[in-house]
Amino acid sequence: MTTNYIFVTGGVVSSLGKGIAAASLAAILEARGLNVTIMKLDPYINVDPGTMSPTQHGEVFVTEDGAETDLDLGHYERFIRTKMSRRNNFTTGRIYSDVLRKERRGDYLGATIQVIPHITNAIKERIIEGGEGHDVVLVEIGGTVGDIESLPFLEAIRQMAVQVGREHTLFMHLTLVPYLAAAGEVKTKPTQHSVKELLSIGIQPDVLICRSDRTVPANERAKIALFCNVPEKAVISLKDIDSIYKIPALLKSQGLDDYICKRFSLNCPEANLSEWEQVVYEEANPGGEVTIGMVGKYVALPDAYKSVIEALKHGGLKNRLTVNIKLIDSQDVETRGVEVLKDLDAILIPGGFGYRGVEGKIMSANYARENNIPYLGICLGMQVALMEFARNVAGMEGANSTEFVPDCKYPVVALITEWRDENGDVEVRDEASDLGGTMRVGGQQCHLTEGSLVRQMYGEQTIIERHRHRYEVNNMLLKQIEAAGLRVAGLSADRKLVEIVELPDHPWFVACQFHPEFTSTPRDGHPLFAGFVKAAGAYQKRQVK
């Protein structure tokens, strides 16, 4: 089987939406029966985004196999059925790290290590490895054409077009076509200059995606085609739109998928976008709306919670409800009190690291529990719910996590290596143990408790969800907490780690150690988010009565 490559680049300005455009095109090609995957090549020097600030980079998306990746991989999984893996995302830092490790081992036999050919060869090897077994591979190059950081990647894909053959490679370039109100027209010159920049590197784009706040007129598209040496039918207008889930249909209506299939000589049926039409219909025809408060520490940049925000919207689709998300800084709860939580139909506390704002999250969990407001805690959101319950219900005054107070009297949350077994002996788990070291990352099996609310929502006994955390519930204090009324609703494969807790005497109070947002999609939703939004709607109705 021959693999075909579509290389996606961006020009003029950043944040044009390369990831969404690539994912939307992939969705159309998948709907034509093709086996499609998407890769993201990031030009920054960090080895991966795992230790980058969420307020700079946005969220870290975790794949099934435990890779900490760019948030664009979340878009990819929400648009296509293919599961992403560590092969779908790599950075300049990762490439240089691998090449330097080989050099230290002597793999290059004393050769002088250079960007060309050693770095570019490593990039090409990664692309080919990531695309194995697929009909079409879309490869998104991060950054903007003209950035010095992107040059090795652009040179690598130029070489791939020569080596793989132009009949199996296609360059798709996103560019800005701004509208000038004073002139009353769109301007094509930035696009021409962006293409000129690409040509200077040796890349002739085959498809131009013209981003604008309005439809680019046919005469302007013809002008772009002529000056940029691109067929007129390959100049696609992609205007700003109120829903990203309308983009597959918008691209298909302009024949982009037909053009690509003909270019690659792929004989496949017409795309059936009925699933996406259903998503758009559900989004456009809600039966009501709910307001959900998300209490976090990175609210200045909503992209830090991108998958959570999207998953809440998916939960709304499944319940035909518009979800209005109110982002609340947990430090505001600390300084202004629970007044900032008024008029919410539900409260969600997402994951996070560090002590700043934790007490505000604990106050929020307390407010939700005492006022019967639907609550969903994710990762740290589960840990703060546990701390709150231990303090105020189980009689464990000052209960905390050793992440924040290492010597606290009641460490209800602790590092794996800090646990003691029932005999009082320290239980040590290192990298060779079945459940890894102090960081659990990636898909893990979870067994749901019979008769629990989550067992009812999932409709399955065993599930697999993705984790990214260092701290866990301390089993030594668990019995006292359970005796006070908290139910353990999910356990790890070896039955040693608490994965889900819930309150049986609360209308809807669920907290999980894993990140369910990473597996939610617009077409299928996710049981926890669908149930959470449904509970928010029910709470709203009770308040009206």
Swiss-Prot record:
Positions bound to L-glutamine: G352, L380, G381, M382, Q383, E403, R470
InterPro entries: Class_I_gatase-like, CTP_synthase, CTP_synthase_N, GATASE, GATase1_CTP_Synthase, P-loop_NTPase
Keywords: ATP-binding, Glutamine amidotransferase, Ligase, Magnesium, Metal-binding, Nucleotide-binding, Pyrimidine biosynthesis
Further remarks about this protein from its record: CTPSs have evolved a hybrid strategy for distinguishing between UTP and CTP. The overlapping regions of the product feedback inhibitory and substrate sites recognize a common feature in both compounds, the triphosphate moiety. To differentiate isosteric substrate and product pyrimidine rings, an additional pocket far from the expected kinase/ligase catalytic site, specifically recognizes the cytosine and ribose portions of the product inhibitor.
Function: Catalyzes the ATP-dependent amination of UTP to CTP with either L-glutamine or ammonia as the source of nitrogen. Regulates intracellular CTP levels through interactions with the four ribonucleotide triphosphates.
Family, similarity comment: Belongs to the CTP synthase family.
Protein name (record): CTP synthase
Species in which this protein is naturally found: Pectobacterium atrosepticum (strain SCRI 1043 / ATCC BAA-672) (Erwinia carotovora subsp. atroseptica)
